Amino acid sequence: MGALPAHLQGRDVEFESGSGSKLRGWLIPGRRGAVVLMHGFRVDRRQMLGRASFLSEAGYGVLLFDFQAHGESPGKQITIGYLESRDAQAAVEFMKKSCPREKLGVIGLSMGGAAAALASPALEVDAMILEEVYPDIERATENRMERYLGGWARGLAQLLIMQLPLRAGIEKSALRPIDRVGAIKAPKLFIAGAKDRHTKLDESRELFAAASEPKELWVVEEAAHVDVHQMAKEEYEERVLDFFEKRLR
């Protein structure tokens, strides 16, 4: 993993999660407002360093952490948001204790956004950004099978999903952010890539429609999966900072 980049002045942290894992991460202190960053599938907290940099520069305290079974956080298996939702809850609680007087926001990317949306009870934060989050595990699996193996493979997705209870002890009904997002009371900004083949645009629109107000949707025309910040860096940072400025300060 290595150390936190020198331009980000922070420290190593670890905290317990209801997933059964001890989560490891970096905590960067700020002047006003705090944000928890939640990475995607099969990567680690370093995926969120670009976001951490501009948020820290704007004065926000930032927590980056590894979900269970990712990076430096131990765990037996990745559960695509199920156990990770407990990690999301633990990270929010850790940040509240670390920054008790600050308003708190979340940015969840792909699986990280699913974990944030699936948390039960719903995360009690002041603002939430959900980027390219799948609405349900069926379509998430079908899209990936089609993306990597071709359209004929979509039918294999159901075989994989049928194995969830046996292999992971998870029912497919537990991996439906679309059923949980309405319980999130915080203002929400949904971000979608128009060329995303993992979470298709109509699926992002469905998830947005299921969410409670207040909410916003931003579609990035040229972006595929998880590359919104890279594709539209200046506009992304402007929109995110504006969204948090209104709600965390």
Segments predicted by a language model, with ranges:
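Catalytic histidine neighborhood in serine/cysteine hydrolases
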Residues: F208-V226
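Catalytic histidine-centered segment of alpha/beta-hydrolase-like enzymes
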Residues: A223-E237
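The serine-hydrolase catalytic nucleophile loop
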Residues: F41-F54, F67, D202
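An N-terminal hydrophobic leader/cap segment in hydrolases
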Residues: M1-E16
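Conserved alpha/beta-hydrolase
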Residues: A52-P74
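Hydrolase active-site cap/lid region
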Residues: L118-E171, D179, V219
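Alpha/beta-hydrolase active-site loop
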Residues: Q47, I78-C99
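Short beta-strand/loop motif that positions the catalytic acidic residue
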Residues: A183-K185, F190-A192, D196
